[in-house]
């Protein structure tokens, strides 16, 4: 029995559902962050902000605001890793998977492979933030003490 504690069982359906769930968290929270930022600066929302690699940049205010939204989204998705993945070892795997599918989405949306250096830098920073913070949060919950006696104490 001791070898069975927190053993990893290969469950493809669970893994696929977690991938779909993390993609939903990623695009849902990114959409909310972009809508919030667009509302603050009274800009019209566009799918280009999410999928066009040329939008991200330091030189224009919309580019900087989109970059800020991506960074905030990485922090939000780290919470998604905590609540839905719950394993520190799998945080990097799911983070890279989410960003790989985002790369494919950007490639499909704009009909060209993302070549902007700022896009790649933002994605690298987001991967690092999401994976490290997600792993830290998951490890904190994994290392919590396990109560051995849950019965109430009696004053005998």
From Swiss-Prot:
Keyword Transmembrane: yes
One GO cellular component term: trans-Golgi network membrane
Primary location group: Golgi
Disulfide bond entries: none
Summary of the function given for this chain in its UniProt record: Involved in protein trafficking. May serve as a receptor for ARFRP1.
UniProt family annotation: Belongs to the SYS1 family.
Name used for this protein in its record: Protein SYS1 homolog
Naturally occurring in which organism (per UniProt): Homo sapiens (Human)
Source species taxonomy: Eukaryota, Metazoa, Chordata, Craniata, Vertebrata
Gene name tied to this protein: SYS1
